[in-house]
């Protein structure tokens, strides 16, 4: 899970260097998300797949609100750090016990994904974090370019 940790660490580095105004502004592009919303979605996604499904923790999730989320980027960095600390434990559960709770809801993916293997779920977390790190990097660069 070192790739997940690297992605989360890089997200923290980007967001910690932003003011609230910078973190909460989306590029002027259709459907674009703010850096804060991207990070909030990553927290929600990891809490859902790792915490709720794999670990059985039943963490409430409102996926749609993740993309409208606004707040202090420093506090979001704390949440990303929490996810960094939890992922190794979720991976251990996945590899030793499998998935503890397949009934939880909180994703737009189809219901059959909740029947996927624990390994698939871990790989999904890694893929999503890597994908959204790239999105965050591009978003940061677009916003910086617009400020010049």
Language model regions located:
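Short, contiguous alpha-helical
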Residues: 1-15, 20-66, 104-148
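Acidic/histidine-rich alpha-helical segments that form the ligand environment
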Residues: 68-106, 117-125, 130
């Amino acid at each position: 899970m070192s790739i997940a940790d690297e992605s989360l660490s890089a997200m923290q580095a980007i967001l910690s260097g932003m003011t609230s105004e910078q973190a909460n502004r989306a590029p002027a592009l259709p459907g674009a998300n703010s850096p804060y919303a991207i990070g909030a979605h990553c927290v929600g996604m990891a809490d859902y797949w790792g915490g709720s499904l794999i670990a059985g923790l039943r963490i409430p999730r409102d996926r749609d609100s993740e993309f409208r989320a606004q707040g202090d980027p420093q506090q979001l960095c704390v949440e990303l750090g929490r996810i960094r600390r939890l992922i190794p434990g979720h991976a251990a559960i996945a590899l030793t016990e499998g998935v503890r709770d397949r009934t939880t809801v909180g994703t737009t993916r189809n219901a059959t994904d909740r029947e996927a293997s624990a390994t698939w779920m871990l790989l999904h977390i890694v893929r999503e974090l890597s994908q959204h790190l790239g999105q965050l990097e591009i978003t940061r660069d677009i916003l910086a370019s617009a400020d010049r």
